Structure formats: C-alpha cells, structure tokens
C-alpha cells in the first residue's frame, strides 16, 4: 500500500445521539424478555442498523437493529421508526447458536490441535461457543437480507458464515466458511469490500463469495500499530469513490476509534 498525501480529507461530522446506548440492560431489563440471558445486553459488538425495504414481510418498523452479545448464544433484533428510538425488542432470536452451524457447546482444549495465531492477543480466552457480530445488508436484486456472522470451530478458530432471509426475521445459515471473524461489508463500483479481524481486507463480487483476501501486510504499521498494537474491530464504508475504515486497536490505552481512507485498485499492491 502506498501513501497518497494528495488525497483530500473526508470532511464529515459524527454526532452522538444519546449519552446511553440504544440497546442496554437499563432500557431492556433481561427479565422482561423470555429466554434472554442476564448479561445479553452488556457486551454488544458489531450491531447493524438498516432501513427496512417495504417488500420484506417481516418488517416491524422503519429501522431494524441486529445485534448479539460478544460471547452470546443468539443474534437478536430490535426495531424502531426513529434512530433516536424508542426501540422495541423482538422476543425470539433471529439466529440461535444451535442453528448457526458453529459449535454450540464450549470445547475442551486439545493439545493435538495448534492454537490459532491470534490467541496470544486474547490472553488465552477463546474456547467459548458463541455467535456474534451480525453484519446485515439489503440485497435488492434478490429481495433478501444477507448477514455475515461468526462463531467457533473445533480447535478454537473463529470464522465467518453467511445467512440469508427473505423476511428479515428468519435467517438460514449457509455451510461455506468465508474467512476470519468480524466481517464488515460495503459496496463500491460493483465490488463488495470487506474489513475483518486484525484489519484484514477482502473483496468479492457476490455475497456468497469466494473472498479475495488481501495480503496480511497490506495496511502499513503506522495504521495497524504493529508490532506493539493490533487492529481489533473495524468498519468500512464507501463514499466518493473511496473506502473509509474506522477501527480500534488492541494495546491502545485509552482505547479509541481511529480512521483512515483507502483508494482501491485492481492489484492489492497498487492500493
């Protein structure tokens, strides 16, 4: 990747709507929602908010918010006509862990299986069955919703799968494994671009893949913070012919959101 000092900066404004999260235990006491674990709203990562199309028969309000606990057993749904709320909770999971095609119970350590290369960054806390980080998009061409989500594999690796829905309520998972966890997608000039765990980037022309993964070293150290830091959670969006990446890093204290712009090219080396 080459620096491009001639790129004009993106001038935008980020407005925090409220002091408290849209989804929290204070707003939705767990005991008021059947089957919701006590801590289900305490550790949410990677929610998706989208304006629902009129063709979706499961549309509850103008906005659907899909979310899950970072170590949770389901993907959930809240809905509202306004971003500021009030939000209501759909009582049933839209994708339970048991139906996710990932491990549904915590595995025991197996010395014969090598640990994933990212385990050191998590202090060994990784053998927990979960389904998390839904990234939901509208596929107008096929009148469906597509959702990237991740879970645990035997041996401790975490990977991403795709689930689809024609109503916005019932999602059907697909078997193929697409790549690392924490997919975030955006479309630009007919291509779907992806950010993932550790700041990995990818691209595909179909929601189902296959995914063309960028080299791990694509992002320079002054962005990733290597070797002392590591990109953890990122989000990518397209605007004015460029990709805009926001992310946090393991090792930053205090933890913060960072931002960079990317100008895509056909060859990864020309980015």
Residue map of PLM features:
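Beta-rich carbohydrate-recognition and catalytic domains
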Residues: 1-133, 137-232, 238-271
């Amino acid at each position: 990747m080459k620096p491009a000092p001639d790129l004009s900066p993106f001038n935008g404004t980020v407005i925090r709507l409220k002091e408290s999260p849209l989804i929290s235990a204070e707003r939705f006491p767990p005991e008021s929602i059947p089957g919701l674990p006590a801590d289900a709203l305490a550790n949410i990562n990677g929610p998706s908010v989208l304006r629902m199309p009129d063709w979706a028969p499961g549309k509850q309000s103008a906005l659907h918010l899909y979310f899950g606990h970072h170590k949770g057993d389901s993907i959930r749904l809240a809905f509202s006509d306004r971003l500021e709320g009030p939000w209501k909770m759909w009582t049933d999971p839209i994708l339970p862990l048991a139906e996710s095609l990932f491990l549904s119970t915590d595995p025991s350590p197996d010395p014969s299986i090598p640990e994933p290369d990212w385990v050191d960054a998590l202090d060994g806390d990784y053998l927990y069955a979960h389904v998390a980080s839904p990234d939901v998009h509208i596929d107008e061409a096929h009148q469906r919703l597509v959702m990237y989500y991740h879970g645990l594999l035997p041996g401790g690796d975490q990977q991403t799968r795709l689930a689809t829905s024609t109503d916005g309520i019932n999602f059907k998972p697909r078997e193929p494994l697409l790549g690392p966890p924490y997919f975030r997608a955006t479309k630009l000039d007919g291509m779907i671009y992806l950010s993932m765990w550790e700041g990995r980037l990818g691209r595909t022309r179909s929601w189902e893949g296959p995914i063309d993964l960028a080299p791990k070293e694509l992002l320079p150290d002054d962005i990733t913070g290597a070797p002392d830091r590591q990109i953890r959670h990122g989000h990518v969006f397209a605007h004015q012919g460029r990709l805009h990446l926001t992310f946090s890093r393991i090792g930053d204290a205090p933890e913060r959101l960072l931002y960079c712009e990317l100008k895509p090219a056909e060859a990864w080396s020309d980015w």
